[in-house]
Swiss-Prot record:
Entry's localization field: Cell membrane; Cytoplasm; Endosome membrane; Cytoplasmic vesicle, Autophagosome
Protein name: Ras-related protein Rab-23
Binding site for GTP: 20-24, 38, 41, 67, 121-122, 124, 151-153
PROSITE patterns: RAB
Length: 237
């Protein structure tokens, strides 16, 4: 375990074409709500949720990035400092599927090879699917990413995506601490550890995340009851 007065904070970016369900996914996970109304994200939005992963308190800071090309310069700037990534495409949007490799390259160019999950959203619309199962699974294998099929509408596998990424980051964090214990106390460290006793971040300052056009909505910390999902994830060995 980490030190008792330390809190892990993980910056996750949710990336993909417009209208694939990125905003809805974050709203569902952080606030437990779903709306059919589509509102284009202007630049970047931000929500957070506090969870426990393997008995560790973890704060997930979820960044919803615009999928339109006109916002590309803005969203790329917000990739910096990200410690995990969700790549999302829609079951009913072939173009969003074909764009995944490009989105992946943009993220890697800014932050390197961080824990990443590939998500096929809107599986409640499988009857209208534009992507074959083997195509989606093949893409995950080529990119060497954990693959999930989700339905934000039905709340299927949404929590599993973020939990997986949190676990992967914690593994990386603990490995870094083992290799260099002093790293968690360095003001230049960027692995996302907060000193809970004084509320200070030892990497990227949380107050700096809320400037400019970012909307900082703090969700109710009430936890929602987990439901058993009939769809399982597909992982790459």
């Amino acid at each position: 375990m980490l030190e008792e007065d330390m809190e892990v904070a993980i910056k996750m970016v949710v990336v993909g074409n417009g209208a694939v369900g990125k905003s809805s996914m974050i709203q569902r996970y952080c606030k437990g709500i779903f709306t059919k109304d589509y509102k284009k994200t202007i630049g970047v939005d931000f929500l957070e949720r506090q969870i426990q992963v393997n008995d560790e308190d973890v704060r997930l800071m979820l960044w919803d990035t615009a999928g339109q090309e006109e916002f590309d310069a803005i969203t790329k700037a917000y990739y910096r400092g990200a410690q995990a990534c969700v790549l999302v495409f829609s079951t009913t949007d072939r173009e969003s599927f074909e764009a995944i490799s490009s989105w992946r390259e943009k993220v890697v160019a800014e932050v390197g090879d961080i824990p990443t999950a590939l998500v096929q959203n809107k599986i409640d619309l499988l009857d209208d699917s534009c992507i074959k199962n083997e195509e989606a699974e093949g893409l995950a294998k080529r990119l060497k990413l954990r693959f999930y099929r989700t339905s934000v509408k039905e709340d299927l596998n949404v929590s599993e995506v973020f939990k997986y990424l949190a676990e992967k980051h914690l593994q990386k964090l603990k490995q870094q601490i083992t290799e260099d214990p002093e790293q968690t106390h360095s003001s230049s460290n960027k692995i996302g550890v907060f000193n809970a006793s004084v509320g200070s971040h030892l990497g990227q300052n949380s107050s700096s995340l809320n400037g400019g056009d970012v909307i900082n909505l703090r969700p109710n910390k009430q936890r929602t009851k987990r439901t058993r999902n009939p769809f399982s994830s597909c992982s790459v060995p």
